[in-house]
């Protein structure tokens, strides 16, 4: 008997959420073909023979653009539900959203000032 009534569905969800990745890893370990050591590190190029090496260094600029993109992409994910339920939430939710946007504007100004948005 479960101690917290009403949480059976949540416990079931947690068990399934923990079991799916474990089962995926076990299935991969059992069913994946074993490759020889030399071919294991080769780049896959759609069944063609690899041309050149794939181990190159990327410029740090790509990392900075990706980081800024992820930050503002997450902002969009957080603001969309707020915009959908704007009429029902009231003044406090509006003020909270303004504070959230202000923090992101400060972060954007900081990134701009540090040169994270410049390509040259």
UniProtKB/Swiss-Prot annotation:
Pfam families: Oxidored_q4. Its main location: membrane. The keyword Lyase does not apply. It catalyses: a plastoquinone + NADH + (n+1) H(+)(in) = a plastoquinol + NAD(+) + n H(+)(out); a plastoquinone + NADPH + (n+1) H(+)(in) = a plastoquinol + NADP(+) + n H(+)(out). Gene3D superfamilies: NADH:ubiquinone/plastoquinone oxidoreductase, chain 3 (1.20.58.1610). InterPro entries: NAD(P)H_OxRDtase_bac/plastid, NADH_UbQ/plastoQ_OxRdtase_su3, NDAH_ubi_oxred_su3_sf. Keywords: Membrane, NAD, NADP, Plastoquinone, Quinone, Thylakoid, Translocase, Transmembrane, Transmembrane helix, Transport. The keyword Transmembrane applies. The chain crosses the membrane at residues 10-30, 64-84, 89-109. One of its GO terms (biological process) is photosynthesis, light reaction. It comes from the Bacteria. Its EC number is 7.1.1.-. It is found in: Cellular thylakoid membrane. It is a multi-pass membrane protein. Belongs to the complex I subunit 3 family. NDH-1 can be composed of about 15 different subunits; different subcomplexes with different compositions have been identified which probably have different functions. This is NAD(P)H-quinone oxidoreductase subunit 3. It comes from Synechococcus sp. (strain RCC307).
